[in-house]
Amino acid sequence: MRVSAADRVEILDVVGRADAAATRRDARAYADLFTADAVLDGTQGRHVGSAALLDSVGPIWAAEGPATLHLTLNPVVYPGDGPDEAVVQSILLIIDPAQPITIRTAAASTQTLRRHGATWRISRRTVAPATQPS
């Protein structure tokens, strides 16, 4: 099974918009990119459902400091379990933009997206410590 070029563009747009919303600390815009039954999990806990997601991201972002940039690096899109599902693996880099610029976090991100009508939405986002290549 393959993910079409048009779907890849839409999927990567959703992933990029999620990190842009996180940078702006816009919890509503962030949550709107997820399915109603979405799961966000990783080192900051496990949050299930869009309401829990909306409530949890504020404290998660606040723990990063007053301002951070969320950057998605090297995203690769893979087919998911069905024709309306895709998986994106990438590196999430969280940067403190104050001088001197510092990297706050480098993490491995795996996101599952499902087609929801004519759009794609994140159904699962797992953030884990980045590992060194062997």
Q: Which sequence ranges carry the predicted segments?
A:
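Charge-dense, low-complexity intrinsically disordered segments
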Residues: 1, 5, 44-47, 100
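Short, low-complexity N-terminal intrinsically disordered segments enriched in polar/charged residues
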Residues: 1-36
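A solvent-exposed, acidic/Ser-Thr-rich amphipathic alpha-helical stretch
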Residues: 12, 27-94
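Short aromatic-glycine motifs in intrinsically disordered, low-complexity regions
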Residues: 63-64, 101-102, 114
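Short, surface-exposed coil-to-beta transition loops
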Residues: 70-72, 104-109
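Short beta-strand edge/turn micro-motifs at domain boundaries
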Residues: 85-87, 106-134
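Short, cysteine-centered beta-strand-loop-beta hairpins and adjacent loop/turn segments enriched
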Residues: 94-104
